Amino acid sequence: MQRMIPMFLIVALLLTGCTTPAPKPVSEANTYRQITMQEAIALMEKEENYIILDVRTHEEFAAGHIPGAIVIPNETIGTEEIAQLPDKDQLIMVYCRSGNRSKQASDKLVKLGYTNIVEFGGINSWPGETVSGME
């Protein structure tokens, strides 16, 4: 009987090492979150410290963009640090024209270490006002 107790403890310890880890939060799971346009609008109304990132070309941005957005074309996002986005934990809300480039850019940003990326599709579905120029 006394031999069974140590053996039981060893087996119990070995089995606890076989459990699966808890799922990682989104920010640690090397992914971004996709949300609807309505969810994006609600998030913009609720949050204060966020960046709206337009990943279309400079020409598309100048023709019309969401007020307050900055432009960093998808094609320029790569392996180098992005000076306009110094805080990798800040909420960055990404959009493009139809939703394709914003998904690509969001994936690239996550690979660069950004942890709070939200992709909300394209300006084609934006119900709010837009502004033109390179403000």
Describe the residue ranges of each PLM region:
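Structural scaffold elements adjacent to functional motifs in cytosolic proteins
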Residues: 51-54
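Rhodanese-like catalytic fold shared by cysteine-dependent sulfurtransferases
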Residues: 2-7, 13, 18-43, 62-91, ...
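Histidine/lysine/aspartate-rich catalytic loop segments that bind and position anionic ligands
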Residues: 58
